[in-house]
């Protein structure tokens, strides 16, 4: 009867994007359900903003107690300017998907868990707010044809 996981789909993309089933709300940023979703959001936004693709999804999978992700996957749905495997390589060179590093690189512990109260209304994505560090686009280096 707890509150964790009550609005999983609304917290993300309202059913438009794929979702692994892990909840964000009620979890601290060390949990990959939350931090993993944030880093793949930043990676996907950066791919599109850099012009590598018009649309994409970035997926990451983890196992408990394993410090590295089991897999990272990119699908540009055929909109990529270069092959998806090359986009994936650029993403892996730019983003650190290790759980501990996500928290550090996105500064997720700043301000304690109180900063996540804002996510209770209007979700976790799509807002320009200094506390939503995962919404900041990182420049990606690639050779434009």
From Swiss-Prot:
Originating species: Petroselinum crispum (Parsley)
Pathway: Amino-acid biosynthesis; S-adenosyl-L-methionine biosynthesis; S-adenosyl-L-methionine from L-methionine: step 1/1
Gene: SMS-2
Induction: By fungal elicitor.
S-S bridge residues: none
Stated name of the protein: S-adenosylmethionine synthase 2
Binding site for L-methionine: 31
Any GO molecular function: metal ion binding
Quaternary context: Homotetramer.
GO terms classed as biological process: one-carbon metabolic process; S-adenosylmethionine biosynthetic process
Domain of life: Eukaryota
């Amino acid at each position: 009867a707890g509150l964790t996981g009550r609005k999983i789909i609304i917290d993300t993309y309202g059913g438009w994007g794929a979702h692994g089933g892990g909840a964000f709300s009620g979890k601290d940023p060390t949990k990959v359900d939350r931090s993993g979703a944030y880093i793949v959001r930043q990676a996907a936004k950066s791919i599109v903003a850099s012009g590598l693709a018009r649309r994409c999804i970035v997926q990451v999978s983890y196992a408990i107690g394993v410090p590295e992700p089991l897999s990272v996957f990119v699908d540009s749905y055929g909109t990529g300017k270069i092959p998806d495997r090359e986009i994936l390589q650029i993403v892996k060179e730019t983003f650190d998907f290790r759980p501990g590093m996500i928290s550090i690189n996105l500064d997720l512990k700043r301000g304690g868990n109180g900063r996540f109260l804002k996510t209770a209304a209007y979700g976790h994505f799509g807002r320009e707010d200094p506390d939503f560090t995962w919404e900041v686009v990182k420049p990606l280096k690639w050779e434009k044809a």
